[in-house]
Structure formats: C-alpha cells, structure tokens
Amino acid sequence: MATRDSGGQSQTGRSQQGEEIEDVTTEASAEAAERHAEITEDVDDLLDEIDSVLEENAEEFVRGYVQKGGE
C-alpha cells in the first residue's frame, strides 16, 4: 500500500510541475509577443525614415549607398 500512496503523491507533483511549466510558458509567450511588437514598431519607423529620405533626395541616397559598397 505504500507504493500506491507514493504513486499518488508523484502524480500530484507532476501536475503541479505541469502547471508551473505552463505558467512560465505563458509568461515567456507574453514577453515574446511584447518584444515582437516593439521590434515591428522599430522596423516600421526605420522604413518610414528611409521613405522620407528617398522622397526628399533619392539620387543622393543612391550615390551614398553605392559609395559605401552597395550595388
């Protein structure tokens, strides 16, 4: 009968571990989603800045790019 008691305790421990893992995973997912949103916003800002430079003086932008080794 001692085996049954420890088996029940083991299962309880496993379910608690599962809940802890799920909580950590949920927190990590929320942090990843927040970081993804920040990066997306930064990329959008950078693309907007490039667009405005190109609208103002595309020829100068291309010359500068080629001089730096771009093709």
From Swiss-Prot:
One of its GO terms (molecular function) is protein tag activity. GO terms for biological process: modification-dependent protein catabolic process; proteasomal protein catabolic process; protein pupylation. Residues 1-18 have a biased composition (Low complexity). InterPro entries: Ubiquitin-like_Pup. It comes from the Bacteria. Keywords: Coiled coil, Isopeptide bond, Ubl conjugation pathway. Residues 27-65 are annotated as: ARC ATPase binding. Pathway: Protein degradation; proteasomal Pup-dependent pathway. There is a cross-link at residue 71 (Isoglutamyl lysine isopeptide (Glu-Lys) (interchain with K-? in acceptor proteins)). Residues 1-42 are annotated as: Disordered. Residues 29-60 form a coiled coil. Strongly interacts with the proteasome-associated ATPase ARC through a hydrophobic interface; the interacting region of Pup lies in its C-terminal half. There is one Pup binding site per ARC hexamer ring. Belongs to the prokaryotic ubiquitin-like protein family. Protein modifier that is covalently attached to lysine residues of substrate proteins, thereby targeting them for proteasomal degradation. The tagging system is termed pupylation. The N-terminal unstructured half of Pup provides a signal required to initiate unfolding and degradation by the proteasome but is not needed for pupylation, while the C-terminal helical half of Pup interacts with ARC to target proteins to the proteasome. This is Prokaryotic ubiquitin-like protein Pup. It comes from Salinispora tropica (strain ATCC BAA-916 / DSM 44818 / JCM 13857 / NBRC 105044 / CNB-440).
